[in-house]
Amino acid sequence: MFQKVKTIYFGFTLFFSLTVLSDSFDYNNYNNHGVVGLINMPTARFFDESSHGFTFNFSDPDQKITMTSSPFDWLEASFFYTNISNANYCADLEEPICRQDYKDKGFNAKIRLKEEGKLPALAIGLNDFGGTGLYSSEYIVASYGIDNLDLHFGLGWGNLNNSEDFKNPLIYLHDSFGTRPDFTESEGGQFQKDRYFSDSSITPFF
């Protein structure tokens, strides 16, 4: 199924690239997770109000389809469905359904806190906040443009916390922010509030 979708996607991309000017969206692009950003990194940029996107990311082992909408120019929301080819759907391999690839779904959201002016634009976001949390991450990110150069700097929790460079500053507000619950398959469809912005450390990205 994903192979067929991949073929359709490449055909659509070729057609789209021939009919839309390169600067139609002020250089904004969706990243691999269907969020406006660069590769795996989110930015504080947004598409215009009433913009909608449908993205595909085919990598190994993940294949992800994401539908993204911007009902307001300060809000971006998306729903994704993913197939993970190197994991089984469930543990009991004697059952045929368990031998298929693992499937997951979830939601992403990003909110603009400040528009760009003399100071950078500022946004806060959550990835995979309403699913199992397999891809869950939270972030605060700033973006600032200088002519054709767009600069971004952010702080990431969860899956964006790759190097564990700095202590999570929210621990100083409450000790509960210092522990992040592990991913569990049984919690799909639940909002796991005890995971948001929680971790012993954070990682800057730019």
Spans of model-derived segments:
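Long, polar low-complexity repeats
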Residues: 188-206
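Hydrophobic helical h-region of N-terminal Sec-dependent signal peptides
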Residues: 10-16
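Bacterial N-terminal signal peptides that target proteins for export
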Residues: 1-9
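N-terminal signal peptide c-region/cleavage motif recognized by signal peptidases
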Residues: 17-21
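Flexible, surface-exposed loop regions and adjacent strand-edge segments
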Residues: 95-97, 169-174
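Exposed boundary/loop context
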Residues: 4, 15, 27-30
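Transmembrane beta-barrel domains of Gram-negative outer membranes and organellar outer membranes
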Residues: 22-137, 144-149, 158-162, 179-185, ...
